[in-house]
Each structure stands twice: as structure tokens, then as C-alpha cells.
């Protein structure tokens, strides 16, 4: 057995995806399945397709090429704004491309015509999260400069940068922009892409107005979580991905470091609480593999204390007997899963049940 290893339950992932698709479809909303956290893993992509998802959302061309090589067909949506240095390849392999610049929109359209492709453009609008997109107050004026380009939709993002939560008011800003583009500038806006996993909470509570007809979902499907709204989604499974790490040391030590203190190896100042002598287990897993802040122990009585590049320190005082060679399991947040999937040192194992 090789550790650390990431256990992947495709059955639970498929069920999560199916539930999200069914809930959204009842309200006339299409789900774009986001594959980027798995680096475009073909088995994950196939699982989304089995659940009824059509468009696969990706941020990196390499991941799309990986899926295509494995026989996964489009449509694919480019979720990150394109780099000019990759634009030719993007137009060649993506069916939908998000942009936030008129010149880029025109270049996408020009390349699409040259390649005899029908690449559809989604123009991104910033309604407050402060990541990509034209500022909403200037959106109509800027997008109007793109007449002639194949702009079929507008979209926005929530939570990923500013932590902004989707509300009815935010959705209505998009719909107002759609109406002005169509009424005053002759656009036909077929798609209003109303955000990502944080928007599911609004969907559940009837806060998404009619006219928002697409969501781009990754975190909810892969983990059954919504970090922006700080919740576990109770109607979805969290038994989708688990990471296992092997114990390499068990010792009783003070709970506060001894001596003059500076910052840790990552420049962080760590606050330690004096709890006396505690039993600590070190696992062969570190920040090079995961985000230690996003590790959630499966076992009761286990607490993640801190981590360095290759070591994670656990408090196991309340767990019971622990010895070198034992294995602990953890659930993960999105940031933690992203690092685990990206790390070449984490073995990926597909399990029917975990």
C-alpha cells in the first residue's frame, strides 16, 4: 500500500451530480460540470456525463487535451479568461470561452471563423466579487463594442475572490444588463451564467429569478460542500474523496514550543494553546500535498494542529492507542482537494465505496 493516497468514490460523485442537475433542471437551469479540481480526469468527466451534464468546464487547456485524448468529447467551456498566448489553442479546443475585453472577444470570433468553428462567447460581468469581468455599471457600454462577435451569453462569479454571496439583487443586475443589451443593442443573450457553487443556496431557497439559466458547479459535486456559505450541503454526500496518511511518529510532548519563536517555514505566525503534555502523531503528509487548514479528520478524538512541507502534526490524546504505521483518514475542503489532486506524491485510487 502506498501512502499518502486519495480515495475517489465515483458512485457518490455521480449521485451528487445527478441531484444537482435534477434540482436545477426543475427551475430551467443548466449545469456546467467543473472538472478542473481533478485536472481533467477522464473518469471524473465520464461520471459527470453519466449524471446528465453536457458542458464540461475547465480552466486549463492541458486538462481538456487530456480528456480529448481519452475520448471525452465536448462541449467544453473555458472558465478562466484566455491568455493571448494560448488563444489559438483555446479556440481550437473549447466550445465556449469567457472573456472580459472587447479586443479579446473580437479576436476569439476572428479565429473561430478562420477555423470554421462556432465558438460561443460568454462576456463576464463583475457584480461585486472583484475577480474577473467588466464592472457591472459599465457592462452595457463595453459589451456594446463587441457587436458582430458571437456573444451568446453573460456571466458572473461569486465567492472565489471577495467571498461575495449570491443574492436576488445580484442576479437581477445581470438580468437588467441582458435586457438592455437585447433591447438597445440588438444582442441575443441566450445564456445568463449566474455563478458557481455558492449560488446553489440561493437556488434551494427560491432566490434565483427566472432568466438565470446556467450555473457552473464543481465544489458541491465533488465534496458536497459550499465554503462561501460556510456549510455542508446536507442533501449531498461528503463521502466522495478521502485522503489517507501514515503515522511516522507518536510522542508525548508539550503543547507549546519551547524557546524564542519566529515564523514557521511558510512565514506564518502560529498561535499555540497551552494544554499541557499531549500525545501527538506525525503523518507523512504536508503542505506540498494538501492545505492543512482544509483537512477534516474522519475519526473523533483527532485534531489537526499544524503542518510543514512534509509533516502534519495531529493531537491524538483523546483518540486512544496509536502506533507508527497506523493510517488516518481525512475529508477535505476544496483548497485541500485541489492540492492533493495536483500533488504527484499523492496516489490516486478509485474505490467503489469509502
From Swiss-Prot:
The modification N6-(pyridoxal phosphate)lysine is found at residue 36. Optimum pH is 9.0-10.0. GO terms for molecular function: alanine racemase activity; lysine racemase activity; ornithine racemase activity; pyridoxal phosphate binding. It catalyses: L-lysine = D-lysine; L-ornithine = D-ornithine. GO terms for biological process: cell wall organization; peptidoglycan biosynthetic process; regulation of cell shape. Coiled coil: none annotated. Its EC number is 5.1.1.5, 5.1.1.12. Keywords: Cell shape, Cell wall biogenesis/degradation, Isomerase, Peptidoglycan synthesis, Pyridoxal phosphate. Disulfide bonds: none annotated. The keyword Transport does not apply. Pfam families: Ala_racemase_N. Its cofactor is pyridoxal 5'-phosphate. Homodimer. Belongs to the alanine racemase family. This is Lysine racemase. It comes from Thermotoga maritima (strain ATCC 43589 / DSM 3109 / JCM 10099 / NBRC 100826 / MSB8).
Amino acid at each position: 500500500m502506498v501512502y499518502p493516497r486519495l480515495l475517489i468514490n465515483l458512485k457518490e460523485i455521480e449521485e451528487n451530480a445527478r441531484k444537482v442537475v435534477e434540482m436545477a433542471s426543475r427551475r430551467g437551469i443548466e449545469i456546467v460540470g467543473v472538472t478542473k479540481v481533478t485536472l481533467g480526469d477522464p473518469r471524473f468527466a465520464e461520471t459527470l456525463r453519466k449524471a446528465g451534464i453536457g458542458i464540461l468546464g475547465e480552466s486549463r487547456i492541458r486538462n481538456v487535451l487530456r480528456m480529448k485524448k481519452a475520448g471525452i468529447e465536448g462541449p467544453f467551456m473555458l472558465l478562466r479568461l484566455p491568455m493571448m498566448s494560448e488563444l489559438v489553442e483555446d479556440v481550437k479546443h473549447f466550445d465556449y470561452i469567457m472573456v472580459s475585453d472587447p479586443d479579446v472577444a473580437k479576436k476569439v470570433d476572428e479565429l473561430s471563423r478562420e477555423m470554421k468553428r462556432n465558438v460561443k462567447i460568454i462576456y463576464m460581468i463583475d457584480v461585486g466579487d472583484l475577480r474577473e469581468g467588466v464592472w457591472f455599471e459599465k457592462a452595457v457600454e463595453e459589451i456594446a463594442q463587441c457587436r458582430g462577435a458571437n456573444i451568446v451569453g453573460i456571466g458572473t462569479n461569486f465567492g472565489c475572490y471577495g467571498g461575495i454571496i449570491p443574492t436576488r439583487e445580484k442576479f437581477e443586475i445581470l438580468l437588467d444588463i441582458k435586457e438592455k443589451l437585447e433591447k438597445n443593442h440588438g444582442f441575443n443573450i441566450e445564456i445568463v451564467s449566474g455563478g458557481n457553487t455558492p449560488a446553489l443556496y440561493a437556488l434551494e431557497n427560491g432566490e434565483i429569478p427566472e432568466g438565470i439559466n446556467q450555473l457552473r458547479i464543481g465544489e458541491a459535486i465533488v465534496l458536497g460542500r459550499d465554503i462561501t456559505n460556510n456549510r455542508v450541503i446536507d442533501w449531498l454526500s461528503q463521502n466522495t474523496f478521502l485522503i489517507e496518511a501514515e503515522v511516522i511518529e507518536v510522542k508525548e510532548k508539550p503543547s507549546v514550543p519551547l524557546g524564542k519563536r519566529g515564523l514557521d517555514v511558510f512565514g506564518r505566525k502560529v498561535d499555540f494553546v497551552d494544554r499541557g503534555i499531549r500525545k501527538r502523531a506525525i503523518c507523512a503528509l504536508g503542505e506540498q500535498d494538501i492545505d492543512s487548514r482544509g483537512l477534516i479528520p474522519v475519526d473523533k478524538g483527532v485534531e489537526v494542529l499544524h503542518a510543514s512541507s512534509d509533516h502534519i502534526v495531529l493531537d491524538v490524546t483523546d483518540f486512544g492507542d496509536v502506533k507508527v504505521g497506523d493510517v488516518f483518514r481525512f475529508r477535505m475542503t476544496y483548497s485541500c482537494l485541489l492540492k492533493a489532486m495536483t500533488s504527484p506524491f499523492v496516489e490516486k485510487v478509485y474505490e467503489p465505496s469509502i
